[in-house]
Design a protein with these regions (language model features):
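Generic signal for short, ordered secondary-structure residues
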Residues: 4, 46-50, 73, 87, ...
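Extreme N-terminal starter segment of soluble prokaryotic enzymes
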Residues: 2-8
Length: 217
C-alpha cells in the first residue's frame, strides 16, 4: 500500500484566510497527512521586506471585504474581531504549547474568526482556556521552549521560501492562500505533481525586466 503524502501547513491566527483554509483542511486530510505549523506572519514580512495587507489602506479595506465575501460564499461562519491587526503571539504560543494539536488550533481559530473575540480580556481568555482544557496556559506560553519553538517554525518556513499565510508545503511545492485549496486537491489527485506541461513551463519562466531598486534608500 502506497504511503500517504504529507504536507506542512503554515498559518498565523492573525490571518482570516488561515481560518478559512483551516475549515477546509479536513477534506484534504482524507488524502494527505497535514502537520500544523504556527508561524509569526510578521516575521515573514520582515524577512522579505514586505508590507502586510493591513498596512496599505485601500488594500486593507478590500481584503477585509473580500474575506467576508469569501467566507459567505463557501459557507463558513465568520465574524471579524473588534480590531485588526492584533497581536497573535499569545495565541500562537498557545498552539505550540498544545503540541500543534489540530483540534485545539481549530477551536482557537473559531474563537477569533467565528465568534469575533481575541482573548485579550481576562474573562475571554478564561473562557478560551476552558474550551481547550488548558488551565495552566498562561504559564506555558511564557516558557522559553515554547517561544523558541515558534521562532524555529518561522525560521523553517522562511528557509523553505514561504512568503505568506496560509501556505501548504508539499515537498518543494508551495500553495499560498485559502483560495489555492482546490489547486492543492488537484495536485494531490495527480500524484503530487502537475501533469499539464504549461504548469511546468511557467514554474521556470525567464524574467523579462526587473524593477529598479528604490534610489531613495
Amino acid at each position: 500500500m502506497k504511503a500517504m503524502a504529507s504536507a506542512d501547513w503554515y498559518f498565523d491566527f492573525v490571518s482570516p484566510f488561515s481560518y478559512l483554509q483551516c475549515e477546509q483542511l479536513p477534506q484534504l486530510e482524507r488524502s494527505i497527512r497535514v502537520r500544523y505549523r504556527p508561524v509569526l506572519f510578521a516575521g515573514l514580512l520582515k524577512a522579505y521586506g514586505h508590507k502586510g495587507p493591513a498596512e496599505i489602506p485601500a488594500k486593507r479595506r478590500f481584503t477585509y471585504q473580500f474575506v467576508a465575501w469569501q467566507a459567505k460564499r463557501i459557507g463558513v461562519p465568520f465574524k471579524f474581531p473588534p480590531v485588526h491587526p492584533f497581536n497573535p503571539l499569545p495565541l500562537l504560543r498557545l498552539a505550540v504549547a498544545a503540541d500543534a494539536d489540530p483540534e485545539v488550533i481549530r477551536r482557537i481559530f473559531r474563537f477569533v474568526w467565528r465568534d469575533g473575540r481575541l482573548g485579550d480580556l481576562p474573562i475571554e481568555w478564561a473562557e478560551l482556556m476552558t474550551e481547550i482544557d488548558m488551565p495552566d496556559a498562561a504559564a506555558r506560553i511564557e516558557s522559553p521552549e515554547v517561544k523558541e519553538a515558534l521562532r524555529r517554525n518561522t525560521d523553517e518556513a522562511i528557509a523553505r521560501g514561504v512568503f505568506g499565510v496560509p501556505t501548504l508545503a508539499i515537498g518543494e511545492a508551495l500553495f499560498w492562500g485559502a483560495d489555492a485549496t482546490a489547486m492543492v486537491a488537484d495536485y494531490i489527485a495527480q500524484g503530487c505533481r502537475f501533469a499539464d506541461p504549461e504548469m511546468a513551463r511557467v514554474a521556470d519562466l525567464p524574467i523579462g525586466v526587473e524593477r529598479e531598486a528604490d534610489k531613495r534608500k
